[in-house]
Amino acid sequence: MKRNLDLIRNILFAVENSNSIDASLTLNSLSKLHRNQDLLLYHVFLLDDAGFIIGIIDESAPYISIARLTNEGHDYLDTIRDDSVWKQTKSTLGKISGSASLEVVKTIA
């Protein structure tokens, strides 16, 4: 699967916008972001790999329960939060190669 930076950004927004520290986000609650659940799971796994989220992530089940963003997740989201910055960042990425690591995206933004 290919990494979808827009989906990653949208998942981070969804986690940030969850209203309660006691309520975790599940795959079902994220399903409005994309109809392909396998793609959603894959991107949650990537966010977990990057250390941007805290939760129960079981790739074998598969099961997810995202409790919150990490400090690093907040920092990344703050860097790409503004829509005009995000649009410019994606434009720059398109000129370079079309894809990049999350750290490179943060640096460009």
Tell where the protein language model's regions lie, with residue ranges:
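Basic amphipathic alpha-helical segments that dock to polyanions
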Residues: L39-G51
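Short amphipathic alpha-helical interface segments
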Residues: K2-S31
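Membrane-inserting effector segments that mediate pore formation, membrane fusion
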Residues: V85-A109
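A short, conserved structural fragment
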Residues: D48-S60
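Generic structural signal for hydrophobic core residues of well-folded globular domains
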Residues: V15-S18, L47, L77-I80
